[in-house]
Amino acid sequence: MAHQAHAYHMVDPSPWPLTGAIAALLLTSGTAVWFHFHSLTLLTLGNVLLLLTMYQWWRDIIREGTFQGHHTPPVQKGLRYGMILFITSEVFFFLGFFWAFYHASLAPTPELGGCWPPTGITTLDPFEVPLLNTAVLLASGVTVTWAHHSIMEGERKQTIQALTLTILLGFYFTFLQGMEYYEAPFTIADGVYGSTFFVATGFHGLHVIIGSTFLAVCLLRQVQYHFTSEHHFGFEAAAWYWHFVDVVWLFLYVSIYWWGS
C-alpha cells in the first residue's frame, strides 16, 4: 500500500453506488408494476440487487475500516457528523407524517363528521398491543445501551448477549405490529385516519426492520472480533439509530394510539 501523508480516507472507485441506484429504480418501478399488473418479477430483481449491493458495500467498508486502518479519528469524526445529519433528515421525514395527522385531527372537516376519530372508524385500544409494543421497544433501548457499555468495557460475552436480546426484541415488535395490522378494524383505504395511521406506523415498522438488520450485522462483527473498546463506530451508529426509532415510537404512541383514539 502506498504511503499516505494525511489522516483522511481517499475512497477508491466503487460500483456499489451505481448498483444501489439501479436497485432503487427496479424497486420503485417494480412496486408500480406489482400494483397494476400483479407481477413480482421486477420487484424481486430489485430486492436481490439491493441485498447484493448492501452485502458487498458493507463488506468493503469493513475491510477499509477494520483491516486496512482507513477509519482514522478524523474519518470517524466525519462519519459521526454524517450519521447525525442522516438522523436529522429522518426526524424531518417523520415530522411530515405527524404534521399530516395533526392537520387532519385538530380541525376535522364536515366530511369526517366534524369529529376525531372520524365517524365510522373503530380505533385500536392503546392499552393492549400498542402498550406492549411500547414496553418491548423501551426494553430494547435498555439492552442496546447495555451492549454499548459492555463494548466500551471490553466485556465481549455480555455485548453478544445484549445485542442478541435487542435483535430478538426488535423482531418481536415487528411480529406484534404485523398481527395488529392483520386484525385492525380499518384499512389504509379508510379515509385520512387509515392513511395517516398506516403510513406513519408502517414507515416506523420499516425503520425497526432496518435497525434490527443493522444490529444483526453488528452482532456478526462482534462475534468475529471486529470491535474494540476504542474502535466501534459501526455499532455506535446502529445504537443511535435504534434510540431514534424508540423516540419516534413514543411520539407515535402518544399522538396516534392514545390521544388520536
Swiss-Prot record:
<keyword id="KW-0472">Membrane</keyword>
<comment type="similarity">
    <text>Belongs to the cytochrome c oxidase subunit 3 family.</text>
</comment>
<comment type="function">
    <text>Component of the cytochrome c oxidase, the last enzyme in the mitochondrial electron transport chain which drives oxidative phosphorylation. The respiratory chain contains 3 multisubunit complexes succinate dehydrogenase (complex II, CII), ubiquinol-cytochrome c oxidoreductase (cytochrome b-c1 complex, complex III, CIII) and cytochrome c oxidase (complex IV, CIV), that cooperate to transfer electrons derived from NADH and succinate to molecular oxygen, creating an electrochemical gradient over the inner membrane that drives transmembrane transport and the ATP synthase.</text>
</comment>
<keyword id="KW-0496">Mitochondrion</keyword>
<feature type="topological domain" description="Mitochondrial matrix">
    <location>
        <begin position="1"/>
        <end position="15"/>
    </location>
</feature>
<dbReference type="Pfam" id="PF00510">
    <property type="entry name" value="COX3"/>
</dbReference>
<dbReference type="GO" id="GO:0005743">
    <property type="term" value="C:mitochondrial inner membrane"/>
</dbReference>
<feature type="transmembrane region" description="Helical; Name=I">
    <location>
        <begin position="16"/>
        <end position="34"/>
    </location>
</feature>
<feature type="topological domain" description="Mitochondrial matrix">
    <location>
        <begin position="67"/>
        <end position="72"/>
    </location>
</feature>
<dbReference type="InterPro" id="IPR035973">
    <property type="entry name" value="Cyt_c_oxidase_su3-like_sf"/>
</dbReference>
<comment type="subunit">
    <text>Component of the cytochrome c oxidase (complex IV, CIV), a multisubunit enzyme composed of 14 subunits. The complex is composed of a catalytic core of 3 subunits MT-CO1, MT-CO2 and MT-CO3, encoded in the mitochondrial DNA, and 11 supernumerary subunits COX4I, COX5A, COX5B, COX6A, COX6B, COX6C, COX7A, COX7B, COX7C, COX8 and NDUFA4, which are encoded in the nuclear genome.</text>
</comment>
<dbReference type="InterPro" id="IPR033945">
    <property type="entry name" value="Cyt_c_oxase_su3_dom"/>
</dbReference>
<dbReference type="InterPro" id="IPR000298">
    <property type="entry name" value="Cyt_c_oxidase-like_su3"/>
</dbReference>
<keyword id="KW-0999">Mitochondrion inner membrane</keyword>
<dbReference type="GO" id="GO:0006123">
    <property type="term" value="P:mitochondrial electron transport, cytochrome c to oxygen"/>
</dbReference>
<dbReference type="InterPro" id="IPR013833">
    <property type="entry name" value="Cyt_c_oxidase_su3_a-hlx"/>
</dbReference>
<feature type="transmembrane region" description="Helical; Name=II">
    <location>
        <begin position="41"/>
        <end position="66"/>
    </location>
</feature>
<feature type="topological domain" description="Mitochondrial matrix">
    <location>
        <begin position="153"/>
        <end position="155"/>
    </location>
</feature>
<feature type="topological domain" description="Mitochondrial intermembrane">
    <location>
        <begin position="257"/>
        <end position="261"/>
    </location>
</feature>
<feature type="topological domain" description="Mitochondrial intermembrane">
    <location>
        <begin position="35"/>
        <end position="40"/>
    </location>
</feature>
<feature type="transmembrane region" description="Helical; Name=VII">
    <location>
        <begin position="233"/>
        <end position="256"/>
    </location>
</feature>
<feature type="transmembrane region" description="Helical; Name=VI">
    <location>
        <begin position="191"/>
        <end position="223"/>
    </location>
</feature>
<protein>
    <recommendedName>
        <fullName>Cytochrome c oxidase subunit 3</fullName>
        <ecNumber>7.1.1.9</ecNumber>
    </recommendedName>
</protein>
<dbReference type="GO" id="GO:0004129">
    <property type="term" value="F:cytochrome-c oxidase activity"/>
</dbReference>
<feature type="transmembrane region" description="Helical; Name=III">
    <location>
        <begin position="73"/>
        <end position="105"/>
    </location>
</feature>
<dbReference type="GO" id="GO:0045277">
    <property type="term" value="C:respiratory chain complex IV"/>
</dbReference>
<feature type="topological domain" description="Mitochondrial matrix">
    <location>
        <begin position="224"/>
        <end position="232"/>
    </location>
</feature>
<feature type="topological domain" description="Mitochondrial intermembrane">
    <location>
        <begin position="184"/>
        <end position="190"/>
    </location>
</feature>
<keyword id="KW-0812">Transmembrane</keyword>
<keyword id="KW-1133">Transmembrane helix</keyword>
<feature type="transmembrane region" description="Helical; Name=IV">
    <location>
        <begin position="129"/>
        <end position="152"/>
    </location>
</feature>
<feature type="topological domain" description="Mitochondrial intermembrane">
    <location>
        <begin position="106"/>
        <end position="128"/>
    </location>
</feature>
<feature type="transmembrane region" description="Helical; Name=V">
    <location>
        <begin position="156"/>
        <end position="183"/>
    </location>
</feature>
<keyword id="KW-1278">Translocase</keyword>
<dbReference type="InterPro" id="IPR024791">
    <property type="entry name" value="Cyt_c/ubiquinol_Oxase_su3"/>
</dbReference>
